Amino acid sequence: VSTWFKLLTRQSYFESPEVYPSIIRMWWYHDPASYAVGAIAAVFGLLSGTTYLPIALLFAYFSFTGVWAMYRTFVNIYPKLHKHLAIAFLFIPSTFVWGSAVFKDTICMFALGWMIYTTFRVFVNRDFSVRNLLLLALSFYLVYLIKIYILLAFVPALSIWLLTTYSSHIKTVGLRVISTLTFIGVASVGFFFFTQKFAEELNRYSLENIAATAATTRDYLAYVSEKQDGSGYDLGEFDPSIGGMITKFPQAVVVTLFRPFPWEARKVIIMLSALEALVFVYFTVQAFRRRGIVRSFGMIFKDPNLFFCFIFSIIFAFAVGISSYNFGSLSRYKIPCLPFYFSMLMVLLYKDGPELDQSAITNQKRLPKFQSAI
């Protein structure tokens, strides 16, 4: 039992030599993100006799609680659109296929969902219960541990979300400007300390490193795809620098949200991704066609919730699109942004009448009809 706990907490074999016979066969022991999946599976294994299927079901269950938390959060903002939002959060194929097995992505969907829910409860509803604060800390830690780059898209979008939500309640122009500048200052200082605190981890996801890695990955996967008839994609030549990478911003976003195209699919699983991408293309065209491009973006910029979805989706889509270069990997990496982008489309398409106004949301003490699964 003692050795099991030491393995669970990734004790160094220098401090605990008894773990060495076990970790010598685990090459992922020194990768905290990968090992966290195995550690969580080991805990679930206590409840299931270390049988894979029950462990996978537990992963799927907890992932669903996060997705459900996201769904209920947005339903309380747009109660008339509960059916349309259900499609966005609960029925996107990639989300429940890649977010319901023993994967890093499954844990991240759990954490991201509860991070959205608790952030909304704490900062908008002002519900500072111990449960919400603990869930917020846990979800933030899990995302940081397993896929910290999600935070690089989430934190800016969250800051804008909170800024626009709170500033909309201030009627005096001067006070609104002062509060906005104060918020930006505090957010900037907080982001600075965040980057300093996690400088080593964030360095792997700096723009310079991403640019260099993207160029290397592009060349390698292009070679492999040519030799093995693989599912790689190419965004074209670009200089491995920040400026060169930014020039591929539109292509990277498009490949994440709207590709592969049907003629690019060489495998059944890629064809399914292509069909899903066609659905995204269709609803995107319909949403902007119905209201017009100018009115659609005006609606996005005026609604803090839509603006959050837009910023997070676009930043995240760019990050994974510029660095994956393989449709198979991309279909898994992109799932955190899909519900937010599609929910934005649903609101643009079907929000006709007034929903809950922001003051009602802020004063709301409890999200109705939501039953926590944990």
Residue ranges and their predicted role:
Residues 15-58, 258-265:
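Juxtamembrane segments of multi-pass membrane glycosylation machinery
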Residues 41-43, 55-77, 282:
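Transmembrane-helix motifs of polytopic, lipid-linked glycan transferases
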Residues 53, 70-91:
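Transmembrane-helix signature of polytopic, membrane-embedded enzymes
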Residues 66-69, 252, 256-261, 272-299:
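Hydrophobic, aromatic-rich transmembrane alpha-helices
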Residues 76, 125-131, 285-311:
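Membrane-interface helix-loop-helix junctions at transmembrane boundaries of multi-pass membrane enzymes
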Residues 96-97, 131-154:
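Membrane-interface alpha helices of multi-pass inner-membrane proteins
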Residues 101-106:
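Short acidic/glycine- and proline-prone juxtamembrane loop motifs at membrane-interface regions
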Residues 128-133, 167-184:
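Membrane-interfacial entry segments at the cytosolic side of transmembrane helices
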